């Protein structure tokens, strides 16, 4: 899974794109 939006990041657990909250990453 590739996230193109800079506000999203790929979750290593669910392998889906999720929204980033500041410096909080999954």
UniProtKB/Swiss-Prot annotation:
Signal sequence residues: none
Keywords for this protein: Disulfide bond, G-protein coupled acetylcholine receptor impairing toxin, G-protein coupled receptor impairing toxin, Neurotoxin, Postsynaptic neurotoxin, Secreted, Toxin
Principal location: secreted
Subcellular location: Secreted
Expression by tissue: Expressed by the venom gland.
GO molecular function: toxin activity
GO CC entries: extracellular region
Subunit note: Homodimer; non-covalently linked.
Function: Antagonist of muscle and neuronal nicotinic acetylcholine receptors (nAChR) with highest affinity for neuronal alpha-7/CHRNA7 nAChRs.
Family the entry assigns: Belongs to the three-finger toxin family. Short-chain subfamily. Orphan group VIII (haditoxin) sub-subfamily.
Protein name per its UniProtKB record: Muscarinic toxin-like protein 1
Organism taxonomic ancestry: Eukaryota, Metazoa, Chordata, Craniata, Vertebrata
């Amino acid at each position: 899974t590739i996230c193109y939006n800079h506000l999203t990041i790929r979750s290593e657990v669910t392998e889906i794109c999720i929204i980033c909250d500041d410096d909080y990453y999954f």
